[in-house]
């Protein structure tokens, strides 16, 4: 059990309208790439990046919507057990901003209350086409009690910052939690993932 | 809708129940372009699970169904040339009948809010109209996010249980749900009560003068409605069953978490008892005598490899399993346990079926825990969605709330060419998979369905108290009179994430002979007592109390052969709704069979590449010219370690 070389593992989930740059943010962060003209994401369930924060290894498991946001059909199970949500809109697309309350409703219903939500306005490289002012977004995020950041996956602006800040917050939340519930070891029979490894045999 | 659907696919799948979802994943996994649609606003069809308000909306929808006017459908004129004809699909779902709701929990606290609630209901239509998000989703959602954090007083005794959460499996940070449990939101209540005058008449009046301490009222349930994930079907996963194997093989298991069923119970002579089933259980049992322990172990050991000892049962081939058990020198106690709780069969079942069932039970024991069963955290309704996610990851396109008018069939070849949706859009494909509730009356005129009787109860205690109040139990109640059906009872605790703290969610299932209430009420009365009745009673109630109950009949189309449907083109494949059985074997088998019929040379749900092993083409070079390739090509770097997918388990105790 100690073979894993990380101190923390977090599940981060991206949501927001199609085309706002969710996959680009993930690819920029995990691989340093910006893929132009890229449409769907085939066969990629989640991406992993391990970062070091204050000497601690933090493994980030970053999940993308797999295109299910396109027709508003994200499965509930996508939200389950996420530690953080990155709610993304496109600063050059008013519509993607106007849909945020709908996404928040989904979060309310399916995500854990403990989830940390970050609001991200992407595509600041296209500032001349901006439709959503920074002030509006700030007001909205404040009202909804979210962190807020503007990014450019293309220019790599604030992308690292987004994920690293999030990792820091997740670590401090995790610390608080372990302090509060000092007995943090799961009880037998608690929820478990199944795989060949978890099997034991009769007798 | 902002975007319209693409119009060319290889496979169009209508319905998001378990078999359709498995098929979707399987097809998309082989590179087929899959469109997966559902006319409903939620995943799963009759396999779905709902929050409390979601369930109330579901009830309402069926109650209103009859007076909904036929939607004006876009004319198909012009979409279908002379050489083609249409096979219409059904407009309304007719698989659910005889819905009855009873509320026993006190509603007294709600009276003041009522005016506001009705007002709140009025508010809804406009917000629903302005968004494509379903009213089901918005029904229990807070208006303002902040209100989420308003304090809400809970009964005093819940605090020490806060460490009972599920380990997430992927993180060593325990996610505490403590806070969530305390948060209520007033808006939740509103939509629901307004719409439920029908049920109100069933409400058992409660004395307002009662001590409020520890009482769970209807408004508690409504406020905590999000905590509920109430399944329409009640099933468990056999730990050596087909579904578990498929989940593991396809890696879909990574999207879900499971809990062991902790107890097998029996109901005998008016009493609920725990059945010892593992070796350790048998030896530790206080109920069994030493002699009984030996008899039971001897018999169970024989069942594990009964095929090797035909002489033990050959002479009894004519007997039923229960008659056979009598000849094995087992006490009545043990006979009951084996027949009803281990083999879970009817008394009349044949000796071979009984032995087979006993063997299956024993084989499943101990793979993941002390009983042969697993239950998905957040409910069975998660499972179809997990397969849908897998389909989407491999490019499948998802669209809920999308109604289909008809199939379009080429007159000459007799093959289905396309579907036409409610916008009048034509969507072409090679293969069509449809859940049978979508087929029209005309198509199904020769089909005779069985029915399943279901009850969903919210109760305040377990049917069998134990040291831990977090038990998941299954109980088979034998029929009171011969010829009637046994009733399967599953009791879920709050740590399964299917009900609020301090309550239990109880599912009853049997094959129908009458309406669900007529079939199941007697068992409900044997095990539970209505909430209000015992409140006037000074004595400590021995039976758990009923807070809320729902009865309904669900159509069981599992046994229908393809040839019973009229005039379906050969490239239209039919999936059935849920069957009444305990496991999910029927759905998995059906999906696999259909898949092999459609794609005989393809592997069924092979494991996907490990996400941590994926490297992208072009990782080390600058991305290609815009527009040349819309798909990220993934390849597997086999040199990397391949065990990381298992990392979630590494945090689990063994």
From Swiss-Prot, chain A:
Pfam families: Ras. GO terms for biological process: Golgi organization; Rab protein signal transduction; vesicle-mediated transport. Regulated by guanine nucleotide exchange factors (GEFs) which promote the exchange of bound GDP for free GTP. Regulated by GTPase activating proteins (GAPs) which increase the GTP hydrolysis activity. Inhibited by GDP dissociation inhibitors (GDIs). It is an enzyme of class 3 (hydrolase). SMART domains: RAB (SM00175), RAN (SM00176), RAS (SM00173), RHO (SM00174). It is a lipid-anchor. GTP binds at residues 20-24, 41, 67, 122-123, 125, 153-154. The keyword S-adenosyl-L-methionine does not apply. Residues 67-83 are annotated as: Switch-II. GO terms for molecular function: GTP binding; GTPase activity. The modification Cysteine methyl ester is found at residue 200. Mg(2+) binds at residues 23, 41, 64. It is found in: Membrane; Golgi apparatus, trans-Golgi network membrane; Golgi apparatus, cis-Golgi network membrane; Golgi apparatus membrane. Residues 201-203 form a propeptide. The small GTPases Rab are key regulators of intracellular membrane trafficking, from the formation of transport vesicles to their fusion with membranes. Rabs cycle between an inactive GDP-bound form and an active GTP-bound form that is able to recruit to membranes different sets of downstream effectors directly responsible for vesicle formation, movement, tethering and fusion. RAB30 is required for maintaining the structural integrity of the Golgi apparatus, possibly by mediating interactions with cytoplasmic scaffolding proteins. This is Ras-related protein Rab-30. It comes from Homo sapiens. The gene is RAB30.
């Amino acid at each position: 059990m100690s073979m894993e070389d990380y101190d923390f593992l977090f599940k981060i989930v991206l949501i927001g309208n199609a085309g706002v740059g969710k996959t680009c943010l993930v690819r920029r962060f995990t691989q340093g790439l910006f893929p132009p003209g890229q449409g769907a994401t085939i066969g990629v369930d989640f991406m992993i990046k391990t970062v070091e924060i204050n000497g601690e290894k933090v493994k980030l498991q970053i999940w993308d919507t797999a295109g299910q946001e396109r027709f508003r059909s994200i499965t509930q199970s996508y939200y389950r057990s996420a530690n953080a949500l990155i709610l993304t809109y496109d600063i050059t697309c008013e519509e993607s901003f106007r849909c945020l309350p709908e996404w928040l409703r989904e979060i309310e219903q399916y995500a854990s209350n403990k989830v940390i939500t970050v609001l991200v306005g992407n595509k600041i490289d296209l500032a001349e086409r901006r439709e959503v002012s920074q002030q509006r977004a700030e007001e909205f995020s404040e009202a909804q009690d979210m962190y807020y950041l503007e990014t450019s996956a293309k220019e790599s602006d604030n992308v690292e910052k987004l994920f690293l800040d999030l990792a820091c917050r997740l670590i401090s939340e995790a610390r608080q939690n372990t302090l509060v519930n000092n007995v943090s070891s799961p009880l037998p029979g608690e929820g478990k993932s199944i795989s060949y490894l978890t099997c034991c045999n009769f007798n | 809708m902002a975007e319209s659907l693409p119009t060319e696919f290889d496979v169009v799948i209508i319905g998001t129940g378990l078999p359709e979802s498995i098929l979707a994943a399987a097809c998309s996994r082989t590179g087929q372009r899959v469109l997966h649609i559902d006319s409903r606003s939620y995943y799963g069809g009759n396999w779905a699970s709902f929050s409390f308000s979601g369930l109330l909306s579901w009830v309402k929808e069926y109650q209103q169904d009859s007076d909904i006017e036929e939607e004006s459908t876009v004319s198909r004129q012009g979409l279908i040339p002379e050489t083609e004809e249409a096979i219409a699909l059904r407009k309304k779902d007719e698989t659910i009948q005889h819905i009855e709701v009873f509320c026993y929990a006190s509603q007294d606290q709600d009276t003041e809010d009522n005016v506001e609630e009705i007002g709140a209901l009025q508010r809804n239509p406009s917000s629903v109209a302005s968004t494509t998000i379903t009213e089901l989703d918005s029904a229990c959602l807070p208006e303002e996010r902040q209100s989420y954090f308003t304090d809400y007083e809970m009964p005093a005794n819940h605090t020490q249980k806060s460490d009972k959460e599920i380990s997430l499996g992927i993180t060593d940070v325990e996610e505490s749900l403590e806070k969530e449990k305390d948060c209520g939101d007033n808006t939740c209540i509103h939509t629901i009560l307004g719409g439920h005058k029908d049920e109100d008449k069933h409400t058992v009046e409660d004395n307002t003068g009662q001590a409020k301490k520890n009482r769970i009222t209807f408004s508690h349930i409504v406020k905590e409605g999000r905590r509920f994930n109430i399944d329409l079907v009640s099933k468990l996963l056999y730990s050596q069953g087909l579904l578990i194997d498929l989940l593991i093989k396809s890696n879909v298991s990574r999207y879900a978490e499971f809990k062991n069923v902790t107890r097998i119970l029996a109901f005998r002579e008016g009493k609920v008892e725990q059945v010892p089933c593992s070796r350790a259980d048998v030896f530790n049992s206080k109920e069994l005598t030493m002699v009984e322990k030996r008899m039971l172990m001897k018999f169970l050991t024989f069942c594990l490899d009964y095929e090797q000892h035909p002489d033990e049962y050959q002479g009894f081939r004519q007997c039923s399993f229960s008659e056979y058990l009598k000849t094995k020198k087992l006490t009545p106690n043990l006979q009951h346990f084996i027949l009803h709780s281990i083999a879970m069969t009817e008394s009349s079942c044949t000796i071979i079926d009984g032995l087979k069932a006993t063997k299956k039970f024993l084989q499943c024991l101990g793979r993941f825990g002390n009983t042969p069963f697993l239950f998905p955290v957040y409910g069975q309704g998660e499972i179809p969605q997990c397969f849908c996610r897998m389909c989407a990851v491999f490019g499948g396109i998802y669209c809920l709330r999308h109604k289909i008018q008809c199939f379009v069939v080429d007159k000459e070849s007799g093959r289905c060419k396309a579907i036409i949706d409610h916008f009048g859009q034509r969507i072409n494909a090679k293969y069509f998979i449809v859940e049978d509730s979508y087929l029209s009356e005309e198509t199904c005129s020769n089909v005779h369905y069985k029915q399943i009787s279901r009850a969903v109860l919210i109760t305040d205690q377990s049917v069998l108290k134990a040291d831990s109040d977090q038990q998941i139990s299954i109980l088979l109640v034998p029929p009171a009179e011969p010829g009637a059906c046994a009733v399967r009872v599953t009791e879920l605790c709050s740590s399964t994430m299917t009900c609020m703290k301090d309550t239990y969610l109880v599912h009853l299932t049997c094959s129908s002979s009458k309406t669900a209430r007529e079939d199941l009420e007697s068992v409900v009365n044997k095990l539970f007592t209505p909430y209000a009745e015992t409140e006037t009673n000074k004595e400590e109630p021995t039976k758990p109390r009923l807070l809320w109950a729902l009865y309904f009949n669900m159509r069981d189309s599992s046994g229908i052969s393809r040839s019973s449907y009229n005039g379906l083109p050969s490239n239209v494949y039919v999936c059935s709704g849920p069957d009444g059985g305990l496991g999910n074997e029927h759905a998995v088998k059906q999906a696999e069979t259909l898949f092999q019929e459609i794609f005989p040379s393809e592997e069924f749900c092979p494991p996907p590449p490990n996400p941590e092993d994926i490297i992208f083409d072009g990782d080390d070079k600058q991305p290609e010219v815009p527009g040349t390739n819309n798909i990220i090509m993934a390849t597997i770097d086999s040199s990397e370690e391949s065990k990381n997918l298992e990392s979630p388990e590494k945090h689990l105790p063994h």
